[in-house]
Every structure is written in C-alpha cells, then in structure tokens.
Amino acid sequence: MLKEEDKIFTNLHGGQIHDLKSSKKRGDWDNTKALLDKGRDFIIEEIKKSGLRGRGGAGFSTGMKWSFMPKNSEKPCYLVVNADESEPGTCKDRDILRFEPHKLIEGCLLASFAIGANNCYIYIRGEFYNEASNIQRALDEAYKDRLIGKNACGSGFDCNIYLHRGAGAYICGEETALLESLEGKKGMPRLKPPFPAGFGLYGCPTTINNVESIAVVPTILRRRASWFASIGKPNNTGTKIFCISGHVNKPCNVEEAMGISLKELIEKYAGGVRGGWDNLKAIIPGGSSVPLLPKSLCEVDMDFDSLRTVGSGLGTGGIIVMDKSTDIIYAIARLSKFYMHESCGQCTPCREGTGWMWRVMIRLVKGNAKKSEIDELLNVTKEIEGHTICALGDAAAWPIQGLIRHFRSEIEDRIKSYSVAIS
C-alpha cells in the first residue's frame, strides 16, 4: 500500500484549485532551475536509475528512450506528449490534464531539456475539449511567469510548448500515426525503422512519451531516483494511476504502488465487486487491448511482469470489472467492433481481419456457429497478431484470445443451446 507522503498526484481527484499559485503550494515548480542546472546527463541518469517505465502501455524504460536521442543533432529535436487517451476503460491521463496540468508542463520542460528539444507538442484527444482549454490556461500562466518560453526559469534554455488537438481517431494514439497527424497528414502508422529518435516529427529526432510518464518526472528528480525505485517491485518500480470501472461499487482513479494485488486494489478503493468477490466473473486488467483474466487469476499483482506471467498485461492500468451478470462473449464482441471501427486500413491483416473477427463474434454471441469455428477464430487472431505495422492488430486479437483461453466452454454451451433451440 502506498503511503500518503509518497503520492505524486496530490490533486488527482480535483479537490483543490489547479491554477499556478495553488500548484506551487503543492510543490510544483519548486526551484526547477536547480534541476536544470544539474545538466542533461544528470536528468537522464536519474530517470534511468528510478526504473520508470512508460505508463502508456508498452512499459519501455523512459530514461533509456531519452538516451537514444542524439546529443549534437544538426536538426532540431522535438518532444511530443501523447495525450490522445482513447483506450476503452482508461481515463488516467484525463484527470492529470484536468487537475494536475502544471505537473505535466513542468515535466515537459525537464524532459525537453534532457533530450535537447526546444519545442514540445502536447497532442491531446479531440474529444477532450475542456481538458485542452485547461492545459492552454496552464500554459498561458507558465509563459506569463516565465517558467517556459525564452530563458525558461532563468536557466538559459529556451522551451516552447504547444497544444495540438486531435480529431478523434484512436489510431493516433500510436506514436508514429500521431506524428503523421501532427504534420497535418492522415494518421497512419509508419514502418519502423527508422525510429522516431532518428527520424520523427518533420524528419527530425523526436521522443514521444505518455502524459503520466512525463508528469512524474519533476517529483522523481526532486526526491531522487532512489526514492522512486524503493516503491513497488524490482523492475516494476514507482507509483501508477489505476482506473477502476465496471461492476464495482465505487468506480475511481487511484494512485498506488506498482505490484499491489488486483483484489486489494478493487476492495480497498472501489468498494469491492458489486455483489461481493464471489460474484466476480472476469477482469480486464489493463485497458481493452489486453486479455481478460478469469476470477481464479484475479489476485495477481498489478505490474508488468506479474501480469505477463498469467497471460495478460498491465497496459494502461485500466481495470474493467465484470460480474456474473455479464455476457462475456458479447462484451468481447463489443470490443471487436471498436477495433474494427478504429483500424486505419493500412495493413491487410488488420483491415480485413478485424471485420471478419467481429462478424464471427456476433454469431458466437447468438450461438449461431459451429464448434470448429472457435479454433478457426483463434487461428485468425494469430495470423493478425504480429503481422501489422502497429499494435492495433495485436490489440484486436488479444481480447478474443483471452476469451477463448478462459471461457471456451461458455462459447461451446452457447452454440449447443442455439442448436437445441432451432432443432
């Protein structure tokens, strides 16, 4: 359990005013110049030592990612913050944008300095109108107070931060599709290599980070890497914002230590499963793109490695709880429809496969299928997985794989019941 004094996001639920003056009282912008004066190498090394891993889903080392940027580039370097939060079941970044905007902006300055970027773009989801307005007000405050812009915080470093609104496409949450959109083109993922650190925005070195990954940076640097690394578990350090939704008594966002058990998280903060733990059927532990877990596996620790060992993933930390009243086949079919709708259509396996999977899933919901089609569907998911430019194909395949792995008998019973009903 995370101690109160170790929480980074002290205004996560918006109980206090989030303007610049109030944010400073909570510790934001506290002697930021001193952190900048320590130099680029110090910042990158501290983030590496902290063990911070990307909070957007991939879980790659943030400090390592920054170190890939060239130190003496002839081209301008860019930092891009991915605030295009569109994963079903995930709303953590939204609360940071709403209630902790200055943590994000200060993090942008420190991260930009670390990678040598004089320009930073915050790419925000198109539907986040109020959040975009909130961030823009915070940016205006920071510019007025000379915390960013020319000679940011009196450090001699120039850092301009721009807000860019998306247009509602889920695919633009993929980092290279986001760059395409930012350049004014259709948001379609790029082939890699080249990677953004070498050829990113406008063909220049670019680092893309998630909102939460950037927002925790100032606190890590102030309290030092050893403090952050002491929280959580080895290789899964620090705090994490978890979004708990679905069939719980008190849906909420909560900051907790990495490695807390899934059951403890739900019972302590979300008031438990509706109808009690015995009424639990399954949980999606990391946003809609990771495989679900049946009740028997739902006491797993919430970290990257533990969830991988049980065949799922931490993803964004979006926990979707489903009780025994849930039609689990329909629930996954609905996710299939989402991925079909959001596919950009660039890759044939994803363009054709997501639609095919959804049509089969709809028949499985009714039971209007043959048992052999279950294995056929599973084989198609494996043909899509790993055969697309970006991970949307994987995200569409994994929920179905999880369903078949853990609830095959329920699918078979549905098919049998349908056959009996029409005979």
Curated annotation (Swiss-Prot):
Q: Which domain of life is it from?
A: Bacteria
The record's comment on cofactor binding reads: Binds 1 FMN.
Per UniProt, FMN binds at 166-213
Q: Does the keyword Membrane apply?
A: no
What SUPFAM superfamilies would the database entry show? Nqo1 FMN-binding domain-like, Nqo1 middle domain-like, Nqo1C-terminal domain-like
Q: Which PROSITE patterns match?
A: COMPLEX1_51K_1, COMPLEX1_51K_2
Q: Which Gene3D superfamilies match?
A: 3.10.20.600, NADH-ubiquinone oxidoreductase 51kDa subunit, NADH-ubiquinone oxidoreductase 51kDa subunit, iron-sulphur binding domain
Q: Which spans are transmembrane here?
A: none
What is the uppermost EC class here? Answer: translocase
Where, by residue number, does [4Fe-4S] cluster bind?
Answer: 344, 347, 350, 390
EC number(s) per UniProt?
7.1.1.-
**Keywords noted in UniProt:** 4Fe-4S, Flavoprotein, FMN, Iron, Iron-sulfur, Metal-binding, NAD, Quinone, Translocase
| Entry binding sites for NAD(+) | 54-63
Cofactor(s) for this UniProt protein? FMN; [4Fe-4S] cluster
InterPro entries reported in the protein's UniProt record: ComplexI_51kDa_subunit, NADH-UbQ_OxRdtase_51kDa_CS, NADH-UbQ_OxRdtase_suF, Nuo51_FMN-bd, Nuo51_FMN-bd_sf, Nuop51_4Fe4S-bd, Nuop51_4Fe4S-bd_sf, SLBB_dom
Entry's family note: Belongs to the complex I 51 kDa subunit family.
According to its UniProt entry, the function of this protein is described as: NDH-1 shuttles electrons from NADH, via FMN and iron-sulfur (Fe-S) centers, to quinones in the respiratory chain. Couples the redox reaction to proton translocation (for every two electrons transferred, four hydrogen ions are translocated across the cytoplasmic membrane), and thus conserves the redox energy in a proton gradient.
Protein name per Swiss-Prot or TrEMBL: NADH-quinone oxidoreductase subunit F
Task: Give the species this sequence originates from.
Answer: Rickettsia akari (strain Hartford)
